[in-house]
Amino acid sequence: MQLPLIISLYLCLFLTAPVCVSAQAAPSAPGNETTEQLSAYEHLDQFIDVLTLIQKNYVEQPAMDELMSGAIKGMLSELDPHSAYMPPKMFEEMQIETMGEFNGLGVEITIKDHLITVISPIADTPADRAGIRAGDIIIEIDGTLTKDMSIMDAINQMRGPRGSEITLGIMRHGETAPRTFTLTRETIRVDSIRQRLFEPAIGYVRVSQFQQRTAREFKDALKALHEEADTPLQGLLIDLRNNPGGLLDQAVQVCDLFLSSGKIVSTEGRRKTDNFTYNATAADTQPGYPIVVLINEGSASASEIVAGALQDHKRAVILGTGSFGKGSVQSIIPLTDHSGLRLTTAYYYTPNGTSIQARGIVPDVSVEQAVWKKTTPHELTKEKDLNNHLEPPSPQSPPKQDMAGEDKIESDFQLLRALDLLRGWQQMKHLQPCPVDGGHAAS
């Protein structure tokens, strides 16, 4: 490819990419360039000088398309961990991924201190089943060190044909030696919503990611829980643990199911078109049953929007550990060659005006995911174990049995605490206040 054509393409990309973000941004008339545009022209002169020197003097004939791709990647990598350039194939895969299907390992990553760091594994994927955790640092991918590797290059290396193997070197916090994980790539079909019912009429909805159909599937899950309970729900658990985020509009729609008015989230950027406030509507608002939202350090982005909105409106109790702290909004910008940019264009704020960027959502009830061992029956002594104990008088109502399968959650300490909180609330609201004798006072 000739150098003038390369320069022409670069100028087109460099000067028109911001227009792709919003059709409202019009180019300045000739002679009316802004200070920012004039500064860009000056830097382009330097870029063209370097590109010319490479083409004329490099020891081998340079691949100009690779140079251009590398230059664009370099620009984006200087911004923040979430801005990136996506070549055509990767851009196409990204669009498919929002539908909930792709070939890979099922792990959401970011860059922290120039290291590829796990935000969270997606439930029931190769990464999750292998035991990869939020906060793990991926130091090697198939023997290639990842230090200073771009996030998109790391994703590209971890993607691959279904059934192919990949080896990851993982450094875990608190450990001195790396771990090695060999995983087999799968077609990851992410079911963003799972639900179940606990006694007494307490619904549980797990949201693994916010995809294009998540809000609709969430609403369907609530309907299914109502039908299964055959009575109004007495409480709801929303599990956002290890949810790396996803689509902003889906998070807003999920919040709108539980809020009838007021602000859900606002975004603020450098341009007026990036400033927007999303408000709740009265349509289809769920009844006012109590809600507990579960979060942890793997809860990021869109999941933090949901937790923050319900917390600020005092519509839910947030339980677990502090969230990831990703409080920025990325715009997906398609380019003319079918590649694309993922560019950070705004910060988002919870209804109270709080930015959670690098801070995260602080839970109302802090509960670590402790390792909890169920006590076996022979380790406890109860009345029925005593010699000559009295039998209960007849007739006797059979004890309430929780739904089948609840024993599967016994190792999930945070979920158990959340259930206890909702069940306790149901019990406490039926208590009668103790009459107070106005003639006496405690001292």
Language model segments and positions:
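Conserved functional hotspot residues or short segments at active or partner-binding sites
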Residues: Y347, N352-S443
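Bacterial N-terminal signal peptides
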Residues: I6-P18
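Acidic, polar loop-rich interaction surfaces within structured domains
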Residues: E297-A300, G308, D312-I318, S323-L380, ...
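Sec/Tat signal peptide C-region and signal peptidase I cleavage site
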Residues: V19-A23
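Positively charged n-region of N-terminal signal peptides that target proteins for export
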Residues: M1-I7, S443
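Cleft-lining beta-strand/loop regions that shape enzyme active-site pockets
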Residues: A26, G31-H43, F47-M64, I96, ...
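Glycine-biased strand-turn-strand hairpin within the trypsin-fold
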Residues: A26-D45, D49-N57, A63, E78-G106, ...
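Extended, small/polar residue-biased N-terminal targeting/export presequences
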Residues: Q55-I119, G163-T167, M171-I193, L416-H440
